[in-house]
């Protein structure tokens, strides 16, 4: 199941969350190495945009809860359709 996730961090001073933010990228690298996070890009200003390929909604829910523990944020999630499926 493919999902586009857009994070909108809480409006805190960047310096207040700098230490926690430093742990975000190493944490995300574990999901990239497993092929779960297909792409992730920082947004200009704050936040990130990611494409996840997960087995279930529950897996995505767990990932987003972990993410929010590192950087408290609101998430917009959009289910996607695999391009190969649409061409079949």
Language model region names:
Residues 1-88:
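Conserved, structured core segments of small domains
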């Amino acid at each position: 199941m493919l999902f586009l996730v857009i994070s909108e961090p809480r409006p805190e001073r960047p310096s207040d969350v700098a230490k926690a933010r430093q742990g975000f990228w190493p944490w995300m690298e574990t999901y990239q190495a497993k092929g779960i996070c297909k792409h992730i890009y920082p947004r200009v200003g704050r936040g990130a945009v990611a494409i996840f390929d997960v087995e279930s909604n529950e897996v995505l829910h767990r990932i987003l809860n972990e993410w929010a523990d590192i950087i408290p944020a609101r998430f917009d999630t959009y289910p996607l359709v695999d391009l190969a499926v649409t061409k079949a």
